[in-house]
Amino acid sequence: MIENKFNNTILNSNSSTHDKISETKKLFGLWIYLMSDCIMFAVLFAVYAIVSSNISINLISNKIFNLSSILLETFLLLLSSLSCGFVVIAMNQKRIKMIYSFLTITFIFGLIFLLMEVHEFYELIIENFGPDKNAFFSIFFTLVATHGVHIFFGLILILSILYQIKKLGLTNSIRTRILCFSVFWHFLDIIWICVFTFVYLNGAI
């Protein structure tokens, strides 16, 4: 009996160590991916800066963009970041219902943000300010749409996490996925703050 308990202790210890190593590898892989994303967005921002500096008219402040709507989008995304933070807190407390609630709130805010962004694109296109208008709108659509695509995949990730929790419970693997999602979502918030400041706010001045 003592030998069995000793063996079980060793197995549990090995399992815990394996989970920690797996979590570390996944988080490290995520950071590598985010670094590549940073490079991609840095290139897009650089191209935008070059193009916008070579146009004679300030298109952002020329009443083409609805800045109040952009401000609301930013507020919604910041709220989603806050609710995402509460997801991690609830996870650490092993409160599955709270995880569900805050993930759902994060999803709703993110979805509204994405729909508003799509609506903005639609309004620009029907007013003949699409990506084929000139170089400025081409890089503008590329930059903002690239962020929007990331938001879209983030929403899919939320749905997959909700499904996995329902089927498997709060396993160590799912905890790692939640941590990875949280880092990814906060990264997207930071990128959007840069877009809002560098593109919209700076252009409106």
UniProtKB/Swiss-Prot annotation:
List membrane-spanning regions.
27-47, 70-90, 98-118, 139-159, 178-198
Give the CC-aspect GO terms: plasma membrane
Q: How does it sit in the membrane?
A: Multi-pass membrane protein
Q: Does the keyword Disulfide bond apply?
A: no
Q: Does the keyword Ion transport apply?
A: no
Q: Where in the cell is it found?
A: Cell membrane
Those parts of the protein on the Cytoplasmic side are: 1-26, 91-97, 160-177
Which PROSITE patterns does the record match to this protein? Answer: COX3
Q: Which UniProt keywords apply?
A: Cell membrane, Electron transport, Membrane, Oxidoreductase, Transmembrane, Transmembrane helix, Transport
Q: Name the family.
A: Belongs to the cytochrome c oxidase subunit 3 family.
Return the protein name: Cytochrome bo(3) ubiquinol oxidase subunit 3
- The organism is Buchnera aphidicola subsp. Acyrthosiphon pisum (strain APS) (Acyrthosiphon pisum symbiotic bacterium)
